[in-house]
UniProtKB/Swiss-Prot annotation:
This is Cytochrome b. Heme b b562 binds at H83, H182. Its main location: mitochondrion. GO terms for molecular function: metal ion binding; ubiquinol-cytochrome-c reductase activity. The cytochrome bc1 complex contains 11 subunits: 3 respiratory subunits (MT-CYB, CYC1 and UQCRFS1), 2 core proteins (UQCRC1 and UQCRC2) and 6 low-molecular weight proteins (UQCRH/QCR6, UQCRB/QCR7, UQCRQ/QCR8, UQCR10/QCR9, UQCR11/QCR10 and a cleavage product of UQCRFS1). This cytochrome bc1 complex then forms a dimer. It comes from Artibeus toltecus. InterPro entries: Cyt_b/b6_C, Cyt_b/b6_C_sf, Cyt_b/b6_N, Cytb/b6-like_sf, Cytochrome_b, Cytochrome_b_C_euk/bac, Cytochrome_b_N_euk/bac, Di-haem_cyt_TM.
Length: 379
């Protein structure tokens, strides 16, 4: 008798994606982040759904409704802090996932990579709009500053900003539409995840060596499902103490002050996971130039496959490229630190230097180093 999981129209799709999927036998723990991101997305949708049952998207009551969730709803504080810190965990996994792709040359699967970039933009948009919802000081001013950047677009900028605001300033209409989009976008993200997996399963997974792994494949279940479960437990071990002991560690204290359009906070900054892009934005004195640099800091990932000059796919056997990769990581940490600092000397020049280095490493140094390594291979 044939197994039902191989014959049932629905089960056979799940089977070919999560059970009998052939996977390279050499996958390291860096391949765990895809499944961790799936878990993060599930947790965010579930906690967000229950939070939405108690939240009101009105400027007069939004702040109080979040307070009500934390104080009066059964385990509301847990839902709220799981959702807020779950977003941080989501971005940690997301950045590590992208970093893994850069290091091991996974970007050569261009369809999967490009859908991944779309996913990154969608998740960033979702997180930005979610940060506005508690309607604290940083929510309001963050929304004002970031949406105002669109006014740098020639001709249509001002009208575009007012169209997004639904008026002449960030107000009730803005909050309502941000809530609507914040609720909708995770489902669009889920659909994009399915497309991402569809393209990935067309080619099969990359592996740490970068060599074709067709002769040496193993089924995903039980080998990698067990490995993924270990990954979930490790992530939970990191997330639980954060949520239960230091839930506000990664947040901004200003967001516990209700939004006040007449008082500007001394330092307006986004959540920590956007600080690197915010530092790049601030490092350029011109508004339009800053906005372009901000968009390019993420969009540059789309041209990484074109810039791949090496004869080897992975960086595993390319020590010079490895040094550059870790320099890029150091630059990103520096940018994240600078993004949270006030705009004054010496932070300005450090931010500008790090921003220039970020683009130089990706656009110039990495391709050049690859060509040097290709030359050294002939020796």
């Amino acid at each position: 008798m044939t197994n039902i999981r191989k014959t049932h129209p629905l089960l056979k799709i799940i089977n070919s994606s999560f059970v009998d999927l052939p996977a390279p036998s050499s996958l390291s723990s860096w391949w765990n982040f895809g499944s961790l991101l799936g878990v993060c997305l599930g947790v965010q949708i579930l906690t967000g759904l229950f939070l939405a049952m108690h939240y009101t998207s009105d400027t007069a009551t939004a702040f109080n409704s979040v307070t009500h969730i934390c104080r009066d709803v059964n385990y509301g504080w847990l839902l709220r802090y799981l959702h807020a810190n779950g977003a941080s965990m989501f971005f940690i996994c997301l950045y590590l996932h992208v970093g893994r792709g850069l290091y091991y040359g996974s970007y050569t699967y261009s369809e999967t990579w490009n859908v991944g970039i779309l996913l990154l933009f969608a998740v960033m948009a979702t997180a930005f709009m979610g940060y506005v919802l508690p309607w604290g000081q940083m929510s309001f001013w963050g929304a004002t500053v970031i949406t105002n950047l669109l006014s740098a677009i020639p001709y249509i900028g001002t009208e575009l900003v007012q169209w997004i605001w639904g008026g002449f300033s960030v107000d009730k209409a803005t909050l309502t539409r941000f809530f609507a989009f914040h609720f909708l976008l995770p489902f669009i993200v889920t659909a994009l995840v399915m497309v991402h997996l569809l393209f990935l399963h067309e080619t099969g997974s990359n592996n740490p060596t970068g060599f074709p792994s067709d002769p040496d494949m193993i089924p995903l279940h039980p080998y990698y499902t067990i490995k993924d479960i270990l990954g979930f437990l490790v992530m939970l071990t990191a997330l639980a103490p954060l949520v239960l002991f230091s839930p506000d560690l990664l947040g901004d204290p200003d967001n516990y002050i209700p939004a006040n359009p007449s008082i500007t906070p001394p330092h307006i900054k986004p959540e920590w996971y956007f600080l690197f892009a915010y530092a790049i934005l601030r490092s350029i004195p011109n508004k339009l130039g800053g906005v372009l640099a901000l968009v390019m800091s993420i969009l540059i990932l789309a041209i990484v496959p074109i810039l791949h000059m090496s004869k080897q796919r992975s960086m595993m056997f390319r020590p010079l490229s490895q040094c550059l990769f870790w320099l890029l990581v150091a630059v990103l940490f520096t940018l994240t630190w600078i993004g949270g600092q006030p705009v004054e000397h010496p932070y300005i020049i450090i931010g500008q230097t790090a921003s220039v280095l970020y683009f130089l490493i990706i656009l110039f140094f990495m391709p050049m180093t690859s060509m040097v390594e290709n030359y050294l291979l002939k020796w």
